[in-house]
Structures are given as structure tokens and as C-alpha cells.
């Protein structure tokens, strides 16, 4: 080895262990990235202040026109009704039923239902429907109550109906998250105002859940009930800070709250800022509720769980009974939603009904759709969900309204382009509504009697603690909890403080904006294969995993403590729950007025069992054939629509829907007599009966019959219809083929995209 070579070898050996270039590149990037991150935080704070300064802040991506101001009602509230202005180029048909979207008042401001162009509002516009939006102002009207809001929302729907006198149906109503239970309360009190109701990610049965999951339902028990809600309302000088509700959501996922969300921005700071700021505009727009409103929500819903058993009583002494709803109810939830898991969205049916026959006896149509993987917010804001589930609901709203009473699951499968019935499918998916039973609901998870008793113990303890608070503590809190103190408490809230800290008023951040401009002009991003960058990424994943593990461990601890405390026989006996082994919650009975209505309806259907002509006979026959398969889809509905237009154009869509439901109920009442009456109904109009025979066969060819019972029924019905076909006289010596030629449905407006 020469003297010239010897120095170079140790130097070469040191290079892999001292990657100075990589280190320098990493630290330059980290310094620049830190400045850009601080600049985004400052932009977030500026956006927060600008948003809060608006008289009616919202995050809608559409223009609006004020229709009604709830503050001007006899019982004023801070809710408003606006008409959404359709984007240019979209044709809106005012004769189509309007869609009304109700936004959740759960700590955030309004607008999440129209947060993106591809949203619930967007897909309703694409289907050609007028759209309205019910939002709210950040400050409540002094003294407003939940009952006042229910009355105001009913008044809003009355106005929408009045604005569309020629619409082909009552408004379709969407209630997102916490707006879902409010919409259901309005529908129970004023069922005549509603078309189909879609409740998306909405909790309706608050105790329901699965062991090992759904920890949020235990929170009220560990806090000793709703006395803390009352304390927060008193400290807020009669107003409850919605930021506390948002903090409950954030506590569910400590990994995302304390690390992932901010690290994702830091690691993608060059591209992620617009998306981050867009979401933070809504997430940081905290609002206020009256203390009385929040106390009602906590006592009657979250802890009391009274909505699903008709336990809520209004000031006029009437129960809010969800069985009073006459419109179809569509429940949309997700298995990945840890805020409103499927049991909390669906188990209200188990609370109210013994069986599907009980649902039918109340004339109700309930549909559910369960997503496999989307989170809570994704139900409202995900573009993929909007393009699939919400689009199909909007496109098939008329089929949903014509479905016979019962319980169904909406099953969506990709459209087969090569299928001979592809022209009958309006969107990218074929929607099938498959009959289900309450056992299918139980399969998602439900409480045992022991579980119910534990939550009932929480409700009793909550009442005791609330009484003690109001007797011994509240008189000492209220005198010093003035408006000024309440405002400072809100500013110092852990969720609001980060927005307040990074404002331009902070002297430590005066130069951040100019530094960020300089960095953008001289940006030196690190290479993705940089060793230190990759180590940072691995460290980030490790921190995220650790926080997830902490969250899982915390949830298991919370659950075990809850069951240990409230499962105690001694505690349950002290609060009066051991006096009986029966379930602490009882299914509500049926009042005498409704029993009389049902008796009258049965008498009417029995009397008219042989009434009608070939149209009624064809619908009755189709239902009779298809009932064993338990499936309805949009292809059959389009053909039924075609039948209505071809053979009875004078029959309105509403009358047609009523006819379908009446024929289904007639079959349920006395199936054999109903079928035996078909020949006489066909004889009323022989020529029309002949056309109906062709139509019925075409329907069955398109839809198919899967079960042996259905095939046997088809043979029975075919014999009835074929024996009454009138031979058609040939024109120009050539026989004419009777065949329905369905038109290809247009995407917008989607008047022709009905299902069935």
C-alpha cells in the first residue's frame, strides 16, 4: 500500500457511517418544514377568527337564498331555512320532490352536508331535485328548547311544501348525525310533512353496543350521569360550550388527535395545507347551546335513552312515538363508525317492535344500509360514499316510497354493462332491497337484559346526582358564573386555545408569514430515500401505534370499570332495579286510537278485496309472485312505471304508490281470497287485461323468479292472465309484437332514474 493510498481508505470507510450530506439535507428540510407548519397554524387561526366573525358562518360549497329565519317564529330559535342555489348547467325540475338536508348541531357549525360539491346536496342536484338546507347560528336564542326546535323544523317543512305545490311527493329529508334524532322527532309529531327520511350516522338507541367495542356509551356512567352537564351549563352562564362535545369525539381516537393529524400535515406540508385548512374551518367552528337544550339531550337521549321507547313527552302531554312515522325510513351507518356504531343506529327497531309483522302492522317501511369501512365523518363528506350510497338513495327515492311495509336491507352491486337489463339501471350500481328480519338487526349486536339493567342503573344514579347537584352545589355556582367569566372559560377551552395561540396578534409569531414566503421561494425538500427521513417516518408510526395501544387499553379499562360498578347487585338494588327480574325497559304499548285506526283499515281492505281492475290485478299478481323471493330492485320499478304510463297515464305517481301498498296489505290480510279475486278484476276490462298479461310476463322475464314457491305462483297467475288475453288484430297483415321498450335513463335530471 502506497503512502498516497492510505489516507483515502479510512475516509471511504467513514462515509457510510457519517452521511453528512443526508443529515444536512434532512435538517434544512426540517427547518423549512417547521416554518411552513407554523405558517399553516397561523393561517388556521386567521381563518378561525374570520369564520367566527361572520353573522351566519357555514362551510357549504353552494350558494344560498334565505327562505325562513327561525328567530322570527312565535317560539324563536336560532335555526334558518335556506334554498341551495344549483350550480350553473344543472337542470332542476321543480315538479320533483325537494330534498331538505338537516345538519347536526353537535358542537360544530353547519354545512357538513354540503361540504363538497360531490355530497348529499350534490347528488340530489344531479338527480334534478330542488334542495334546501336547515342550518343554525352559533348563538342560541335565549330560552329556546328542543321542543321549540322541533316546532320550527316542522314550520320549515310546511314552507318547503308550500313552495312546491306541484311536486310529485312530500320532501325527502336527510338528517345527519345528531340531526337524525331531531328529524325523527319531527316526523313522529308531524308525519304528514315527510316523504322518505334518510338518517345518516344518527344514534337512536343510545345504550346499544357490543362488548369490547363502542366505548363512548360508557362515558355517562363513569362521570356519574348528567350533573356535569348541568355544571358546565351553569359555568357558561346558561350556555353550554359545544367544544365539550367535540372534545368527546376527539378523545375517542387519541392517536389521531394528539399525533397523526398534525404529523400528516407536517410530513406533507407542501401539498396538504389546503385540505387541512378546509376541514379545520368546520372542525374548529364551535357553537353554543342553551344549557336547557343540552340537559334535555343528555337526560332524555344519551343517558335516559327514551326516544326509542316513546318515553319522551312533550309539553302538550303527547309521547314522541317513532311508530307514528308514516314515511319510509332509510338508516345509513357504518361498521367502522365508532361514534354511531350500527347497534346505536339500528337497535331502536328492537326496542319498538316484536317482529317484522309488527313493523308491517304499523304500516312502516324501514330500510338499512351498512358500510363496511367508512368512518363517521365519511358518511357525510366522503366523495366515494356520495357517488355510491347517497347517489343511489337520491336516484331511487320513488322506489323507496313505493316499497311495501316491512324491513329491508339496501344491497348495491356494480351494474353489469353487458346485461340485457342494463338500460333499466339508472346509475353505476344496481340497488336491491332485500327483505330482512329483526334477527338480522340483532346480528350487528344488541344488549342483554343484564346490560340493560346496568344502563338503567346509570340513569337512576344520574337522576340522584343531578338532584344533589341542584340542591347543594348549583346555588353556589350560579351567582359568580356571569357572562364575562363564561366567555373567558370558553377562550381557555383546550380545543379553542390552539386556535387563539397562533393568531397574528401573538408577538412571537410576527415574522412567521414572511419567513414562510422566503422558504417557499428557496424550498429544498428532502429526498424520500433519505435515511433520517425514513427514520422519522418509522418513529411517527411507532408513536401512532403507541397511542392506539393506549386508547385500546383505556377503552378496556373504562368498560371493565363500568360493568364492575353498575353491574353490582347491591348498587342496582339501592336504586330499585332488583325489585323485578324483568327488563328495566318495556316496549311501549299501542294506544286505543291507533288500534281503532288499524281495525278500520282492515275492515276497509277486506271490503275492497275484490275491487279494482286489471292494473290492480297485475300489481297484486306481481307482488304475490315476488313475495317469496323477498327482493325488489329498480329494474322492476322502471317497468312498473312504464306500465303506469302506458295503461293509465291519468294515474298520478302518488296514487300509483298508494295502489301498490294497498295491494300488498290486501295480500297480507287474506292472501287466498285476494288471489281468487283476480279473475273477476281482469274481466272488468278485457282489453286492458290482455295488455297486463303481456306486461306481467315481461316483468317476470326481466326480474326472474328464484324460489320454487315463486315459480309455482307464476304458473298459477300466468294461467289466470293468459286465459283472458284478447287476440290482437294484425295490422297490414303482420302481427304486432307486444313488448315494453324501456328508455335509457338520463343521469341529469334523473326523473327517469326511478327504481324498483
Predicted ranges, named:
Residues 2-18, 137, 302, 306-308, ...:
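Alpha/beta-hydrolase-fold serine-hydrolase catalytic core, especially in secreted/extracellular enzymes
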Residues 58-60, 64-140:
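Short, surface-exposed "cap/lid" segments of acyl-processing enzymes
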Residues 174-179, 183:
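Gly/Ala-rich beta-loop-alpha elbow adjacent to hydrolase catalytic centers
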